[in-house]
From Swiss-Prot:
It comes from Pseudomonas putida (strain ATCC 47054 / DSM 6125 / CFBP 8728 / NCIMB 11950 / KT2440). Keywords: Cell inner membrane, Cell membrane, Chemotaxis, Membrane, Methylation, Transducer, Transmembrane, Transmembrane helix. The keyword S-adenosyl-L-methionine does not apply. The gene is pcaY. This is Methyl-accepting chemotaxis protein PcaY. GO terms for molecular function: transmembrane signaling receptor activity. L-quinate binds at residues 71-78, 135, 142, 158. It is a multi-pass membrane protein.
Length: 550
């Protein structure tokens, strides 16, 4: 179908922004529909995965419940056998484990029934719960028969438990078959959902390809072709050719670009004419400026020579004043260092005094503790005397018991062995008591020697403290004298520094004036050179303007 003239005019005036808006809107709608479809498919898949997971959990709950129920009955049987063998403690543990397993299996069955919402599972789950209650009752009867040690009652309830377990196994098989069929049904539904999603994705892909082709055709016809034409105009303008006029194309963004390009071409033509006029005026002004700058440069050179002589004289005076200031500052610094050393010595003496006092107090405390230790050692010796007396009496009693056992003959042999062991223990206790008494005697002697040594250390520490206090008083006098010397040196250094500062300020001002004079001379020289360069640039500018084709 060939587009009519009105249609072509409409496309020429169609805003690129509007066209791109429609294209992007179609793409956005396609993307939105694709996203919604994918979201719907994902929700369906999530539901199916959840159902499969619940089905698997139901099978696990059912199998674990039956396994724990079987283990509960097995523990009761083991407990019954152990109780018959006289192992009551082990049988009790078996009974407790059976109760725990029965409670866990009951919880799993209740959870299975609660989650069995399908009609096909609901009836079987209810029957399973009732049958499990019968089985739990039979196992409880086994535990009761075990506690009563009734073999007849145990075999009776054991038969009931076996029958209930048989029905539970049959129900488990039916439930597992039903759950498996439900899982297969979910997988078939998932396959059908996947096929629908794939077909929908292919359709959306076809729509996207068609939209992409239409978008490319619009961009190639309404954007790329006009931009190539505009690029040709830009290349000609960049090369200096302004002779080819720019024609407008429509009222859209590309048309506005061509209108602005036309305005730029005309503006460059006007600018080139103005530049040509300005170049002639600059040539005349540069000649006059060159003469004025030559005269200014000569005057500034003479002024710089006179300032150089004045700056040299002030620099020599500044050097002398700074030497005086440095000597005063050096003296002040030396005095300050002496003051710091004196202060440091005073602090160290103060720390020595505090340390000596603390050491004296600690030695006195240690001496008191050692005195307490001596008393405690004496108390321990008294306790050991009592223990030794008790062991001697125990030895005598064991000897009497051995004699009585010997009189009893064969009937008292076991008692004689015990009496002999008691006598041996009493003998060992007596020997250990003697060894401890010897060690306590050594500790007591060492402690008394330590107390005497502590007392001597206390006396020496007190003497050291008195000497340190006297040294601190002497250092305090030295510190005060150094402080007065430091204050006087600071006054001298401050006065010398003020004089040096004034001299430096004068020297700096003269140097600044000389620097400004040099800068002015250099500026005049640069201005002269710039005026000459400006004359050359005027010629070059005229030549450049001549290169353009208007």
């Amino acid at each position: 179908m060939v587009p009519t003239r009105s249609t072509a005019r409409m496309l020429a005036n169609l805003k690129i922004r509007t066209g791109m808006f429609w294209v992007l809107s179609l793409f956005s709608l396609t993307l939105l529909f694709s996203t919604a479809s994918a979201w719907w498919a994902a929700l369906g898949s999530d539901q199916q995965i959840t159902e499969l997971d619940q089905t698997a959990h139901q099978s696990d709950r059912l199998n674990n419940a039956l396994l724990m129920a079987i283990r509960s009955s097995a523990n009761v049987s083991s407990g019954f056998i152990e109780q018959l063998g006289g192992h009551d403690e082990s049988a009790g543990k078996r009974m407790a484990l059976s109760v725990e397993l029965n409670n866990k299996s009951q919880a799993l069955v209740d959870e299975f029934v609660e989650n069995a919402r399908e009609p096909a599972l609901r009836g079987l789950a209810t029957e399973l719960q009732a049958t499990f209650a019968e089985y739990a009752k039979a196992v409880a009867g086994q535990r009761e028969a075990t506690r009563q040690r009734s073999l007849e009652q145990y075999f009776k309830v054991n038969s009931d438990a076996g029958n209930a377990m048989g029905r539970l196994q049959t129900l488990r098989q039916q439930l597992v078959t039903t759950l498996s069929e439900r899982g297969q049904q979910i997988m078939l539904e998932s396959d059908r959902r996947l096929a629908r999603a794939q077909l929908l994705s292919l359709c959306l892909l076809g729509v996207t390809v068609v939209l992409a082709v239409l978008c490319w055709a619009f961009i190639a016809q309404r954007v790329l072709h006009p931009l190539r034409e505009a690029g040709g105009h830009f290349r000609r303008i960049a090369s200096g050719d302004l002779s080819v006029p720019v024609q407008g194309q429509g009222n859209n963004e590309i048309g506005q670009l061509f209108h602005e390009l036309q305005r730029m071409q005309q503006s460059q033509r006007d600018t080139l004419g103005q530049i040509n006029n300005c170049a002639r005026q600059l040539d005349a002004a540069a000649t006059a400026l060159n003469a004025v700058t030559e005269e200014s440069a000569n005057n500034l050179r003479q002024q710089g020579q006179e300032l150089e002589q004045a700056a040299t004289a002030v620099t020599e005076m500044t050097t002398a004043v700074e030497e005086v200031a440095r000597n005063a500052i050096t003296t002040s610094q030396t005095t300050s260092e002496s003051n710091q050393l004196a202060a440091q010595s005073r602090r160290q003496v103060s720390e020595n005094i505090d340390g000596t006092e603390a050491m004296t107090r600690e030695i006195q405390t240690s001496s008191a503790h050692l005195q307490q230790l001596v008393g405690q050692v004496r108390d321990i010796g008294k306790v050991l005397e009592v223990i030794r007396s008790v062991s001697e009496q125990t030895n005598l009693l064991a000897l009497n018991a051995a004699i009585e056992a010997a009189r009893a003959g064969e009937a008292g042999r076991g008692f004689a062995v015990v009496a002999d062991e008691v006598r041996t223990l009493a003998y060992r206790t007596q020997q250990s008591t003697q060894e401890i008494e010897q060690m306590i005697g050594s500790v007591q002697a060492g402690t008394e020697a330590a107390v005497a040594s502590m007392q001597a250390s206390t006396n020496r520490a007190q003497s050291t403290l008195d000497v340190t206090l006297a040294s601190g008083q002497v250092l305090e006098g030295i510190y005060s004298a150094i402080g007065e010397i430091n204050e006087r040196n600071l006054v001298i250094a401050s006065a010398a520094e003020e004089q040096a500062q004034v001299a430096r300020e004068v020297d700096r001002n003269l140097l600044n004036i000389r620097e400004l004079s040099n800068h002015s001379a250099a500026g005049a020289q640069q201005t002269s050179e710039a005026s000459k360069a400006l004359s050359g640039l005027v010629g070059e500018m005229t030549a450049l303007v001549g290169r353009f084709k208007v």
